C-alpha cells in the first residue's frame, strides 16, 4: 500500500479530531476535600474515592473554620457531617457514595450538592457496606431545602 499525501492528511485530521475526546475520557473528576486531620473515616472515604477514579486533593481544617466553610458554601447545619468536598461547582457533604457523585455530575441539577448527614454506619468510609444501616443521600437545593436523592436500605 502506498501512503499518499492525501491519505496522510486525512489520517492526521482524524487523529486531531479524536484527541480531545480521548483526553476527556482519561480525565479523572477532581474533588477538593476539607477535613479534620484527626478523622480516620474522612481518610477512608477519600481512599474509596481515589479507588473509584477520582483525583482527590485535601486541605486540613479544624472546628470553627470547617463549620464556616460549610456555611459559606450553603451546607445547612442539619446536613452537616465530618468533611466537605467541592467538585465541579457542587458541594459534597459527608460520606456520599462515589456512584451518587457521578450521578450528580451526569444529571447536573440546579442545586448546592449532596449530603449524607451524620456518619451512618456502613456508608463509604464508615465500616463494611455488607453491614450498613439504612441511610439517605440528600440533594441540597439552592434555597437550603433538601430531598432524598438516593435511599440505601440496611444490609
Regions found by a protein language model. Give the residues of each.
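Conserved helix-turn-beta segment immediately C-terminal to the redox Cys motif
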Residues: 48-57
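Active-site-proximal beta-strand/loop segments in catalytic clefts of secreted hydrolases
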Residues: 34-36, 61, 95, 117
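Stable alpha-helical elements in mature extracytoplasmic
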Residues: 45, 62-65, 97-101
Amino acid at each position: 500500500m502506498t501512503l499518499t499525501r492525501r491519505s496522510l492528511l486525512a489520517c492526521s485530521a482524524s487523529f486531531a479530531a479524536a484527541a480531545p475526546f480521548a483526553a476527556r475520557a482519561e480525565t479523572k473528576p477532581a474533588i477538593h476535600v476539607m477535613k479534620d486531620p484527626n478523622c480516620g473515616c474522612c481518610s477512608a472515604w477519600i481512599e474509596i474515592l481515589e479507588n473509584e477514579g477520582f483525583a482527590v486533593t485535601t486541605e486540613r481544617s479544624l472546628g470553627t473554620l470547617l463549620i464556616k466553610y460549610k456555611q459559606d458554601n450553603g451546607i445547612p447545619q442539619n446536613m452537616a457531617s465530618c468533611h466537605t468536598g467541592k467538585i465541579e461547582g457542587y458541594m459534597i457533604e459527608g460520606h456520599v457514595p462515589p456512584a451518587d457523585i457521578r450521578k450528580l455530575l451526569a444529571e447536573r441539577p440546579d442545586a448546592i450538592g449532596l449530603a449524607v448527614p451524620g456518619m451512618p454506619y456502613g456508608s463509604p468510609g464508615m465500616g463494611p457496606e455488607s453491614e450498613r444501616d439504612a441511610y439517605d443521600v440528600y440533594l441540597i437545593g439552592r434555597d437550603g431545602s433538601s430531598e432524598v436523592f438516593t435511599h440505601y436500605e440496611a444490609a
